[in-house]
Amino acid sequence: PRTFSSAASDVYKRQLLINVGTPDEPTVKSVRDYLREFLLDPDVIDAPYIIRQLLVRGIILRVRPKKVAPLYQKIWMEDGSPLRVYSDRITKSLNSMVEDVEFEFAMRYGNPSIKFGLESLKQKGVEELLLLPMFPHYAQATTESALKHAYKQLKLINWQPKIIEMGHFETDEEYVIPLTKSIQSQIDKDTHLLFSYHGLPVSHVKRIDKSKNHCQQLDNCCAIKSEANQLCYGHHCMLTTQTVVGLLGLKEEQWSLSFQSRIGPVKWLEPSTTNKVEELVNRGIKKLAIVAPAFLADGLETLEELDIGIREHFLELGGEELTVIKCLNDNQDWVEGLSKLVDKKFSQSATA
């Protein structure tokens, strides 16, 4: 394996914390515990406290765990949740690849917890800590929630290392080049490529726009670069898409963008993946490939929602061939890219 040495190793010991989330087991109880922690996070459902409690405890947790647990059972791997298995593999690969940085992974929701990861790093005498939420596109419900929770846990364990944050990396070549390569081998000139991103309530992206004149106010607002949408999730998704489309050399009619994994009756980013697939079949698309760039590791949203649910839907509508492209997972190009992203961030910190 190739070995990378991060910059300024004589100045600090540097460590990495990776933040993701999954149930411990594919059981109703475990899924309920996971969903409770996940959905009661005010950064995920930003309704007033009482309404959020009533919605989650009174409705969602009574119904959804029974529906979701069997779906997890379909995709569960021998060593556990796919998300946890791939996170563990990525961490081990990074630790063998990078000389002077020790990597730990933790889950924002579920186990191993962020607190557990931080305590482990504290015991090892870490002086400089990079917090890396494993989400290429910034969102309050993912990136912001993970960082806020990490700072809260740091305070609880009374630890004050030098902190570096990795906020988002939607167009960094270390991410988009491995992503593009993973797509390239799965499509040909007759394939329509659908970029399916995790959905987000419109209220979350509108909150980012302090001007109140851009988000959902302009046609195709996510495609227009502006001071107002520098941290907009929809804009970041569009930037990734445009970058990959450019690298692949696709024409406008050869690709589409959509959003999946909706929960609840609020307004979400459009179009939905389900509706977009229907539209594409109605346009005469018979050969479709779907890539989910917001997910760095395969999980329920890709292995079940796309590869089982959307596949069945596409074929029932009259589609003929569907390829669901695997997430980057522990792909060697991506792991090397991630190590370079980390090195770049530490180098920037050392010269700041």
Give the positions of each predicted feature.
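Single conserved hydrophobic/aromatic residue that forms the stacking wall/gate
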Residues: 1-8, 12
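N-terminal glycine-rich anion-binding loop in soluble enzyme alpha/beta folds
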Residues: 13-105
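A solvent-exposed, charged loop/short amphipathic helix patch at secondary-structure junctions
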Residues: 37-41, 208-229
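A structural motif corresponding to the C-terminal end of an alpha-helix
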Residues: 90-102, 157, 240-254, 317-319
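Long, hydrophobic, well-ordered secondary-structure blocks that form the structural core
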Residues: 104-179
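A short, acidic, amphipathic alpha-helical segment used as a generic capping/interface helix at domain edges
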Residues: 118-119, 264-285, 309-311
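Short, flexible loop segments at boundaries between secondary-structure elements
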Residues: 159-173, 220-242, 257-260, 309-337
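C-terminal accessory extensions appended to soluble enzyme cores
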Residues: 278, 291, 308, 325-352
